[in-house]
Structures are given as structure tokens and as C-alpha cells.
Amino acid sequence: MAKPKTPEEKNYKVIAENRRARREYAIEEDLEVGIVLEGSEVKSLREGGSNIAESYATVDDGELWLVNSYIAPYAQAKTWKHEERRRRKLLVSRRELSRLWNATQRQGMTLVPLVMYFNHRGLVKLKIGVAKGKKLADKRQTDAKRDWNRQKQRLLKQNL
């Protein structure tokens, strides 16, 4: 029997990453969800034309939606062009949907997309995080910790 792959061995191609989310929000948990796309959107993603930095996820009428994400138009699509900033449905189980909805009902919580990628089967997946906005002091603390860790690594390298 084959042993399961570790996270380092999993092969996936990152399409878009929301780097600002880790700085602006305190991520409590993350979840991998599927996304409903049109054919021209998938082809455009394979070319690398997307941005999820300004987008967010929301629960409407018992469904999870990705709002304000940008997927560039596909140049070869003539008649079936997609809308660049349309709402895209996210695929998630009912149990996870109710858990996410309950999480967003708490004060200051939101759903933020972290990474969009092709998984090992070639399907587009989105990792969303349940997040709470950071205050300015929290951001400074995070920066100070990161700087201190860099300094420690430099000192360890010099001593070796």
C-alpha cells in the first residue's frame, strides 16, 4: 500500500496568492474549497491572469460566494467571454458552510481568500481563511517578531 503524501510532496501550481491577507488579518483557520468557473476563465488562469488581493467570500442564501476576484479575459475567447469581476460560487459541504456562516456571525470575523491554485488533478482550488482584522499595534508586533526571527537566523549562521 502506498504511503500518503506529506504536504511537502504534494504538487500544486499556485495561480494567485493574497500575501496581504496574512499581514492585515489574524487567520484562525483555513479551508480548501472548489470554485465554479467557465471554460475561458480556466484557460485564463492557466496563463496566470488573476488577482484575489481585493476579494472576499460571503454566505448568501445558503451558498458561499467569492466576490470581487479578478480573472483576466482570455484573448482567444471570441463569443463566450467571461465577466472579469463576477461573483463566483464556491463549492463546500453543508456542514462546512454552516460552520463558516457561524464563524462570520461573530464580531469582526470575515472570510478571506488566501491562495488560488491547481491541485494535483488539475482542478482549481481556493484556500479561504476565517480571519479577524488586526489593529495597527498587532501588525507592528508581527513585524517585530519577524525581524527578531531573521536576526536569530543570521546570528546562528555566523556562529556556525
Swiss-Prot record:
GO biological process: trans-translation
Native source species: Dinoroseobacter shibae (strain DSM 16493 / NCIMB 14021 / DFL 12)
Pfam families per the UniProt record, alphabetical: SmpB
Protein name: SsrA-binding protein
Keyword RNA-binding: yes
Disulfide partners: none
Homology family: Belongs to the SmpB family.
Alphabetically ordered keywords of this record: Cytoplasm, RNA-binding
Protein location: Cytoplasm
Function: Required for rescue of stalled ribosomes mediated by trans-translation. Binds to transfer-messenger RNA (tmRNA), required for stable association of tmRNA with ribosomes. tmRNA and SmpB together mimic tRNA shape, replacing the anticodon stem-loop with SmpB. tmRNA is encoded by the ssrA gene; the 2 termini fold to resemble tRNA(Ala) and it encodes a 'tag peptide', a short internal open reading frame. During trans-translation Ala-aminoacylated tmRNA acts like a tRNA, entering the A-site of stalled ribosomes, displacing the stalled mRNA.
Gene3D superfamilies for the chain: 2.40.280.10
Molecular function GO labels: RNA binding
